[in-house]
Amino acid sequence: GQWNEQGLLICNEIHPARAKILSENVERMGIANAMVTNETPQRLAEVFEEYFTRILVDAPCSGEGMFRKNEAACEEWSTENVKICAERQDGILDCAASMLAPGGRIVYSTCTFAPAENEGSMTRFLLRHPEFHIVEVKKAEGMSAGVPEWAYFEEEKGQVLLEIAQTIRLWPQHLNGEGHYLAVLKKEGTLRQGYCRNGEEKGIAAKDLKVQGKGIVEFLDFAKDTLDPQTLAGSS
């Protein structure tokens, strides 16, 4: 989005090679106030408690939506891998929840059809985190509603949450693209500028909003004392 260089964008990629590619793309696109980290979600959650106002979780998944253009995705698929991915998504989402400020939003997305990784992941998350709810998104042409009844494997039973119908499925036969799923989650509370979970709340002065790059300088000072420099993307 257009944030007039007043925000701070932190992009995390757990695989070092992809993190370096991501760094190059951020630089090539001229994105201001942005940096790339190469950390586990658990490590980030330790130092960014209720820090972010927006979080995008582009979750690792079984890749069923890529079957048409990626033969490797077909060859690597298995029911067991779907379950492994679903468990990994649970952990990532829990970390995202702890890093989100009150009133903030999480956008969750996958490129798979697997219900366990889509409606299932959202249902499990909402049952673990009652402070969150699904935000209904206006559907564009070709978008379909999530299916609450698909939240569980055939052998499983559990609570069906009707608000899962407010999530979105993208089927390749209905639009020009591959298969995807997305949901928007909102955390209870009121989003406030200057919110600080572990300290005194400090408002943001108007003069500070006009200072280009102020946020990134403050973050880099913080990162030097907190994050492992060997895992910052681009480090030697």
Explain the meaning of each model-derived region.
Residues 17, 53-94, 111-118:
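Mobile active-site "lid"/loop adjacent to the S-adenosyl-L-methionine
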Residues 176-181, 186-236:
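Polybasic, low-complexity RNA-engagement segments
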Residues 2-8:
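Conserved S-adenosyl-L-methionine
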Residues 105-110:
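Conserved beta-strand signature within the Rossmann-like core of class I S-adenosyl-L-methionine
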Residues 4, 100-102:
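Helix-to-beta-strand junctions that scaffold the AdoMet/dcAdoMet cofactor pocket
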Residues 80-83, 119-143, 149, 153:
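Conserved Class I S-adenosyl-L-methionine
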Residues 10-50:
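S-adenosyl-L-methionine
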Residues 9, 22, 55, 104, ...:
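Residue-level signal for inorganic ion chemistry
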